[in-house]
A protein has these predicted regions:
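Short alpha-helix boundary/capping segments
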Residues: 110, 451, 466-469, 473
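A short, structured beta-strand/loop element
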Residues: 437-463
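Short, ordered beta-strand-loop transition motifs
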Residues: 386-388, 431-436, 494-495
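Short, charged/polar N-terminal "headpieces" of proteins
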Residues: 420-443
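FIC/Doc superfamily catalytic core
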Residues: 1-419
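Short, surface-exposed linear segments at secondary-structure transitions and domain or protein termini
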Residues: 264, 459-468
Length: 507
């Protein structure tokens, strides 16, 4: 499951038999930062702060918004967890994969399938599929099996850097050979079940505070056991996700993986440091360094608090309302949404959901006009409902995250783009504007959003539009059209309002 051009597999050496060398499970002690530890007070304070902030954030969200936000956070969690492994699949492409819209490039398609697998597993977890079993040997194996079962064949192979032997990863199978990860030689293959049994024994029956602290400790200790040939990092992060979900009732609306990925060097350094042996008489009583484990727990909990704080800021009602309604007004001016579309979204933001019968009242118009607005917003991907008569709920699409939820994940920029000196196209956001007979799409120059458009005539004459489906013609030739817009922009050939317009007589 590594990048084809940069394979850094876990395996270092092979053993012919899956034997147990009899290592004592005390090798991975301490498994917890105990009550008597000099590090405990500071960590307990962080655990309590995390619990309070998580509860407050969850209470601030209507249940319907909680569900919608959790869907976007799954894509975010998947993006950042895979990014830590060197796999960069933007959430916009992840969202496309969930609609079975895959890249023609084989490697990008494989990464989309990998992302879809991750989201499928997390959705199963968020739905309670692993409740009470996340820390059991069988539960950990099931995470791995479900994830790897959905991976394309090319992502199920790792290569020994010394022998060049290619070894296939079997979904859910415990590691059959010895491995070395950095400077750490993992326990023998036959010993893995014993270590997982001890892991379950310690982490499955903890008080709430210990369970919060244990989420950090267990994250490293599972990586230390290294139960699988590959995929251990993602399994550990999914396990941490479910531990926090169950212990803190997070609602799955924030992701510690985002914090790890944004501080990836520190994350990996802390994990490596936790492999260190006990340093002196002040460093606990286990075989491994208690101080290193405490520092990682501090980092882990601080990242959690940081991510809750970040999501709280994004979801502040007044600010979220302003960003969404600003986007709606822009769409209305472009003719892409009907007038008063903002009334529907504002009502949902205030109430959490909107019964269909109340839509006409919300917009102050006829039922027919209200249905037209609802249809347009649904087609745009920002409204959903569980059925034809069910209440309307908000959706947070990845394509609009940069407008609605800025900073949630990075903009998708073209390779070699220079901020402030280049027009890039971070996310697909195109629509046909009937009254102007143009397809409008958006570029980005640094922090500035640049409106671009191509005429229906240009699409018909040069891009197989044929006056049938202009948006479909645009999407079929999107990269070519974006490159034309980029060249015009860089040459300074702009309209008076700073936009880029592509006409047939220029092509």
């Amino acid at each position: 499951m590594k990048n084809k051009t940069d394979i850094t597999p876990d395996i270092k050496a092979d053993t012919s038999a899956r034997r147990d060398r009899g290592e004592s499970t005390t090798l991975m002690e301490p498994l917890l930062i105990g009550e008597g530890s000099r590090h405990r007070t500071a960590l307990t304070d962080l655990a309590l702060e995390l619990a309070q902030r998580t509860a407050g954030f969850r209470r601030s969200l209507p249940e319907s918004l909680l569900t919608s936000l959790a869907g976007l956070v799954r894509a975010m969690n998947c993006y950042y967890s895979n990014l830590i492994e060197g796999h960069d699949t933007h959430p916009v492409d992840i969202e496309r994969a969930l609609k079975n819209d895959y890249s023609k490039d084989a490697w990008k398609r494989d990464l989309q399938l990998e992302a879809k697998a991750h989201i499928t597993v997390q959705e199963w977890i968020d739905g309670g599929g692993l409740k009470g079993r996340a820390l059991t040997g069988n539960g950990i194996r099931e995470i791995h099996r479900r994830f790897c079962d959905l991976l394309p064949e090319d992502l199920l192979w790792v290569q020994d850097p010394e022998t060049k032997e290619r070894v296939k990863v079997v979904p859910g199978e415990l590691r059959p050979r010895d491995v070395k990860v950095g400077g750490h030689v993992a326990v023998s293959p036959g010993a893995i079940p014993r270590f997982l049994a001890r892991f379950e024994e310690v982490y499955s029956h903890l008080s709430r505070t210990d369970a919060i602290l244990g989420a950090a400790a267990a994250h490293h200790r599972l990586a230390w056991i290294h139960p699988f040939l590959d995929g251990n990092g993602r399994v550990a992060r999914l396990m941490s996700h479910v531990m926090l979900l169950e212990t803190l009732d997070t609602g799955a609306v924030w992701s510690v993986a985002r914090g790890f990925a944004r501080n990836v060097d520190a994350y990996k350094s802390h994990l490596a440091d936790c492999d260190s042996p006990r340093r002196n008489d002040l460093d606990g009583r286990g075989m491994l360094s208690e101080e290193a484990l405490a520092r990682f727990a501090n980092f882990f909990l601080s990242m959690c608090i940081d991510q809750v704080t970040f999501m709280e800021g994004l979801m502040q009602p007044d600010k979220l309302r302003t960003r969404i309604l600003s986007w709606v007004e822009e769409e209305i001016k472009l003719g892409a949404l009907p007038a008063k579309s903002g009334n529907i979204l504002e009502a949902i933001l205030y109430r959490g959901e909107l019964p269909r019968a109340d839509a006409a009242t919300a917009v102050g118009a006829t039922d027919r006009h209200a249905r037209r607005i609802v249809s347009a917003l649904t087609e745009r991907g920002v409204l959903t409902a569980d059925g034809a008569r069910a209440p309307l709920r908000l959706v947070f699409p990845a394509t609009l995250a940069s407008r609605w939820m800025p900073g949630l994940f990075p903009e998708r920029v073209a390779p070699g783009a220079r901020r402030g000196l280049e027009l890039t196209f971070p996310a697909p956001d195109a629509r046909y504007v009937f009254d102007r007979e143009v397809v409008v799409f958006w570029g980005q120059d640094g922090e500035t959003r640049i409106r671009c458009e191509i005429s229906e005539e240009a699409l018909d004459d040069h891009f197989d539009g044929d006056r049938k489906n202009e948006l479909k013609a645009f999407l079929a030739h999107q990269h070519e059209i974006e490159e034309i817009a980029r060249r015009k922009y860089m040459a300074g050939r702009l309209e008076r309002d700073g936009s880029v317009s592509i006409q047939t007589n220029e092509l």
